[in-house]
Structures are given as C-alpha cells and as structure tokens.
Amino acid sequence: MRAVSGVVRKKKVKKILNMAKGYYGSHSKQMKQAKEAVIRGLKYAYRDRRQKKRMMRRLWTLRINAACRPLGISYSKFINGLKKANVIIDRKALSNLAIDDYKAFEAVVEVAKKALA
C-alpha cells in the first residue's frame, strides 16, 4: 500500500493556519501565504525581543537626561557623579524615580553633584 502524508500534512497545515489567525485576507486562509506570513512574523518577533531591551535602555536614558537638565547637570555628568559616589542604582530605577518621586531624584542628583565637586 502506498504511504500518503494525509494525517501529517493536515496537522502541519492546521498548525500554520492557527498561527496565522487574525492575519488579513489570504494570509490567514491559504497555506503558502500563511506560512510566509508566519515565518516573517516569527523573524520579526525574534529580532524585536532583542531590540526591545535596547529601546528600553534608550528610553530610560532619555527620561533621566530630561529630569537632570532642569537641575543643572547633564546625563553623562550625573552618571559619572553617581559612579564616583559609589551609588549603585540602575537606569530603570533612576527613570522610575524621576517619574514617580521627583524629590528623591533631586536628592540623588545632589549626591552626584557633591561627588563631582
């Protein structure tokens, strides 16, 4: 008897079409278009999981810089001052501090300024 790939093929098609749910037009209905769209989507997902980390760090830096400028210090000098003062606070925490508790952030900036002077 001839071996056919009926069951396996149906399972593969179903898997791809399930992954392509919500895609527009033939990308969610036809196997070839769906497979191409899913592969492209997975490539973007892989790439963007890595880019997300870079983008978040850039956002934190931007926020810290924006909070430092009115207090008369640039971002680079602020970070340098923190390093000299042996203050170990990561950029995410500093960013949250600048947004949520500005008074505490001002105190941290003063510590950095004293270390630079």
From Swiss-Prot:
Protein name per its UniProtKB record: Large ribosomal subunit protein bL20
GO molecular function: rRNA binding; structural constituent of ribosome
Record bears the keyword Cell wall biogenesis/degradation: no
SUPFAM superfamilies tied to this protein: Ribosomal protein L20
Keyword annotations: Ribonucleoprotein, Ribosomal protein, RNA-binding, rRNA-binding
Biological role: Binds directly to 23S ribosomal RNA and is necessary for the in vitro assembly process of the 50S ribosomal subunit. It is not involved in the protein synthesizing functions of that subunit.
Gene Ontology annotations of biological process type: ribosomal large subunit assembly; translation
Record InterPro entries: Ribosomal_bL20, Ribosomal_protein_bL20_C
Membrane found in the keyword field: no
Family to which the UniProt record says this protein belongs: Belongs to the bacterial ribosomal protein bL20 family.
Organism: Brachyspira hyodysenteriae (strain ATCC 49526 / WA1)
Any one of the GO CC terms: ribonucleoprotein complex
